[in-house]
Amino acid sequence: MKRLLWKSSLRHLQRHPLQLALAILGVALGVAVVVGIDVANGSALRAFELSTDTIAGKATHQIVGLDGVIPEGLYQQLRIDLGLRRVAPVVEGHAKLLRPDSPTFSIMGIDPFAEARFRNFTSSGPQGSLDLGIFLTLPGASLLAAEAASSLGIAPGDEFEIDIGGAVRTLVLVGHLPATDDAQLAAIRDLLVVDIATAQETLGLVGSLTRIDLIRPPAMTEAEFEESVAAILPPT
């Protein structure tokens, strides 16, 4: 019976070669689409992971508030009361540059002195060195990826305006974010870095942080570290 079915099918296909070709083409296109989707999903996931790793840096733990903010004093408590040194305060938000075709940028306010153990945003890179004094003292000082700044026509020393929920603020580009390869460049393309005081003022978060990054000391176990930090957290 099976042989008869095979012979019948073969005769049909021999009489209709175009149908056979279209069937094979359809299967090939279907496989190509599935493979293409898998590759695209893999690339998107990798880009997301890289972006997340770039922003989080080497942090092993993070403190975030239930309502999106935490009191700035908690950072001092972690450093003074617990004696932790690998702690970094962060203030985050979003804004659009008042430039044609500007994407939405993630604003990240940092403390350069606490950053070195977590991220390399304020280190010297191939695009040029950063004057840390200017970054900390010049009102509105900011950093962008060199590619993003170039595409928007912004050079170091230029002022530019950003829109945050309808409020316009003026910043000045004082340097470029370092990137060692294309993957890292892609992760920081839409990132705008300022010092933490500028971020707090610009985003209306004076006295508050959006998160605190921590690196567990090697001498403490995971449980010991989490218990000591939890002991000074405000009640929920």
Predicted regions located by residue number:
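Alpha-helical transmembrane segments of bacterial inner-membrane membrane proteins
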Residues: M1-T236
